[in-house]
């Protein structure tokens, strides 16, 4: 419980908030100038008047947080042996999100070759080298088609199977860093009230899965003004407290920096939002959340610290399962926040109640971290 570390963390948060407030107006102007705005063409989750209200809203507002956090961390957070991989993984994930955002706006719709068509071409195509190419790329085609159950259908943006590959890369880098660079202590899983359980190399697939799942969970929650930003603010505030309690200086400062930047972002993102986070922010910050929790060896707390995000993601998984295998819907619409919209709840009511529930679980996570 170092007072000096807490004082320094608060300074980082203040600097990040001030920097983000200054950058926000510039970013909004640039997004509008280059027409990086929400389009009803692919935002099929919006309904009625809400669709019309949000069309033309700048997206990629998450760049505000990504830029400020990266700049302050690289300039002032001197323990780079602990921060270069989290920032790098955040950057990879944010790049993927930016590509998806931009392709959804400016890209052309792509067509996927079906598996039966590929098999037919292997048999009947006149040129042997084309047949060879189809044979060599058959595993990729099978993987591509198998992800259609997750919604990887032809469109403008980055498709699910493409996202999974890049997210796997981000997860693999994180797993390498935790397993080989942070030391044997991180080969164990901390359990509240009990101690540590050795996972040995099993920690590697666990880390990869959690980085991928958490990034997508945060992405799914970015559906209402203020929901993802405010929930991330609460999460990183709690994570700052846990890092400080644990005496992890580099991560206390990094999490405080994210918290400060999110204060400014959320100010501009609450309804009516000046901009929306976009995939560039949700995927980047979701990956950073996962890696920062695991880097302080509190992996077991990740579903608690990210409670709302995990609930939103699970609601989508359950909806897909019920529709595919039981032939009916579990929710009126997924993710969960849209279910409550269809029940007649206002956007503000949903967001505020989700925030409060999320805050409650973050308090539980802080308490558990001290046991």
PLM regions: where:
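Solvent-exposed interhelical
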Residues: 223-234, 328-351
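Juxtamembrane non-transmembrane "cap" segments at the membrane-aqueous interface
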Residues: 313-333
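"…together with the soluble PPM/PP2C metallo-phosphatase catalytic core" -> "…together
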Residues: 1-276, 280-311
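Short basic/hydrophobic patches in alpha-helices and adjacent helix-turn junctions
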Residues: 294-295, 320-323, 339-342
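Final/C-terminal transmembrane alpha-helix of multipass membrane proteins
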Residues: 348-368
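A short, structure-level motif marking secondary-structure boundaries and short turns
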Residues: 11-14, 39, 199, 320-322, ...
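Short, surface-exposed acidic
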Residues: 38-42, 347-352
